[in-house]
Amino acid sequence: MFVEFKRGNTSDPFYNDDQLPFEKLFETTCATRGQIVLYSTRLQTYQFRTWAFSVGIFGNVARLFRWDRAGAIVSEPIPYCKRGNHDLAEFLRRFDLMDRVQRGWDPTVFDATREEAAAFDGTIEAVVGEGRNVLLKKLLDSVGDKDNYPRRRVEISTPDGEDERVVSYIVGRSIANARSPTGRATRGFVAMSKGTGKLVFLKDSWRPDIPGMMGEAHWFEKVKGARSVSAFLHGSDVRCVVVRRSGAARTPGPPTNPFQHTLTNLYSGDFCGVRKMVGYIHYRTVQCEFYVPLDMFKDSKHLIQIMYDIIVGMSLLSFAQLPSLNPPQPYRTYTTGGSSIGTSAPRTS
């Protein structure tokens, strides 16, 4: 949780009058909103979170914020300086009693053990070798130095969601980060399967929560083996349950939805605005080919080939053209919320 302090009673960037727009559009108040949005973006980028809290102190009033990938819920102004008002102190007291999951930490991500981190770094060094493949070396260097970027263990449920089918992956720094606190917030990681010790590509994102819209795994299965489509392993919505390694009890999420999903959209209809806010569900996929940012192409010919492959791959995913699929090619690429290009690294499955 972060706290932003602003002096002056006019620094509150929101109106509290139903007859006026909610957001104040003065230059200073727009700058204040931009500042707290930036803080929220950084917080949700560098930590594995499902949501986050923050506090804004604007002169003699305070506001509470709850951020997720759909937007932010903003409280009414709290006159914390007024004698007898304990709302802000009560929030801080309750926040102190919360556990990590209640504060918004992702319950499926853990600090890697020393042995897991060492195995991950050793596998990276073995694949890079002497660094003759410059593109591959840049990709694997993206995991960052172990002293500055702690290794994490990410646990992903297989489609059936059974405890014994949870797969663990070790990751470092992400290849690219989201620049907004809302939306898909796609992040890609070079990851090591803890079970096999092989390197894979793990994509973490938030897919739109729209009835009837299927996750990427559904469509990848339909075009499996097609040219210009990545070699897919598995993918699923991220569940709210924590799988205890001791085999003991699990911690359930909200009873109405077993998956990590946004809440801001559920309350957006109660306030001004004619557009319905779209919610998001946390989603992860794993491919057995590596991917690097689109701007790491080698030359103009490589870039043109990449764009051609993107068009072909997206047409297959969009229309699920199953007959007469071409055999896999060394380079494959796809785009869903972020562009990437396949490397010539060895297949890992």
Language-model segments: residues:
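Activation segment of protein kinase catalytic domains, centered on the conserved DFG
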Residues: 293-309
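Catalytic-loop of the protein kinase fold
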Residues: 317-348
